């Protein structure tokens, strides 16, 4: 992938760390459960109270917006971006104070507005760029996503998250074609990578609210004729309406 900067590597590193933490915590869970079965331990009333705020499955919705700000690293294209999604989460591992959730996001709508740069012939001996704005729409899926919650037994839980997914746009992204460069465009199919954090507020045993920020990257992974990449600072809000 072009423009593979240190910031981009940090996001991949965060996803790797959360994945490793998940497997470690999951292994600890299996060990604890085996010991509990062997000794015939019973679940205490205190643990049952904790479980009221720690159910394994969750359903929710969320939405986010990234304003058009200066690009984060060389080569990325300036853009504004917004998306909404439906989320299924499952708590797959815990430690005493942390919990790991595996999440799947269905994204019915994403919108990006970006700057187009078309090479044109200004005069017989002068080339220039025709710059304007273009909007594209997409839908997609985020099948690989992890969220690491801290203070898992509290009603206010800070968290870290990392995710990888895909978006399919209604047109090639970007599209810089001109008479001088007729093939200067990306692809409709793009990959996404995100990493960040936030705070989850638990209101009762069935509902919670989430406020967060994530670095969000869109790229066709150099499968198109061009791949400038799009980077966004995405602020988002989520609502979990069912836990079971």
What is each PLM-predicted segment?
Residues 1-53, 244:
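Cleavable N-terminal export/targeting peptides
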Residues 47-56, 92-102, 151-157, 203-209, ...:
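Short loop/turn motifs that connect adjacent beta-strands in outer-membrane beta-barrel proteins
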Residues 57-69, 102-110, 160-166, 199, ...:
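Transmembrane beta-barrel strands of outer-membrane/channel proteins
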Residues 61, 65, 84-90, 142-150, ...:
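Residues on the lipid-exposed face of transmembrane beta-strands in outer-membrane beta-barrel proteins
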Residues 65-84, 188:
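Surface-exposed strand-loop-strand hairpins of Gram-negative outer-membrane beta-barrel proteins
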Residues 71-75, 126-133, 178-185, 221-227:
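Extracellular loop and loop/strand-boundary signature of outer-membrane beta-barrel proteins
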Residues 82-174:
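Gram-negative (and chloroplast) outer-membrane scaffold detector with strong preference
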Residues 229-244:
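Outer-membrane beta-barrel "beta-signal"
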């Amino acid at each position: 992938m072009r423009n593979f900067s240190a910031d981009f590597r940090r996001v991949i590193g965060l996803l790797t760390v959360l994945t490793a933490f998940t497997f470690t915590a999951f292994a600890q869970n299996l060990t604890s459960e085996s010991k509990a079965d062997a000794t015939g331990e019973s679940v205490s009333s205190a643990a049952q109270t904790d479980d009221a705020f720690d159910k394994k499955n969750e359903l929710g919705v969320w939405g986010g917006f990234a304003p058009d700000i200066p690009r984060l690293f060389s080569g990325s294209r300036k853009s504004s971006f917004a998306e909404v999604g439906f989320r299924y989460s499952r708590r797959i591992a815990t430690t005493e104070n942390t919990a790991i959730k595996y999440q799947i996001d269905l994204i019915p709508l994403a919108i990006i507005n970006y700057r187009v740069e078309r090479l044109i012939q200004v005069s017989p001996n002068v080339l220039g760029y025709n710059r304007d704005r273009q909007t594209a729409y997409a839908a997609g899926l985020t099948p690989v996503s992890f969220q690491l919650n801290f203070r898992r037994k509290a009603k206010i839980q800070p968290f870290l998250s990392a995710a990888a997914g895909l978006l399919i746009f209604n047109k090639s992204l970007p599209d810089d074609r001109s008479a001088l460069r007729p093939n200067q465009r990306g692809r409709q199919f793009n990959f996404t990578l995100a990493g960040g954090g936030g705070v989850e507020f638990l209101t009762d045993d069935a509902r919670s609210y989430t406020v967060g920020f994530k670095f969000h990257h869109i790229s066709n992974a150099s499968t198109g004729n061009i791949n400038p990449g799009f980077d966004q600072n995405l602020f988002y809000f989520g609502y979990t309406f069912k836990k079971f």
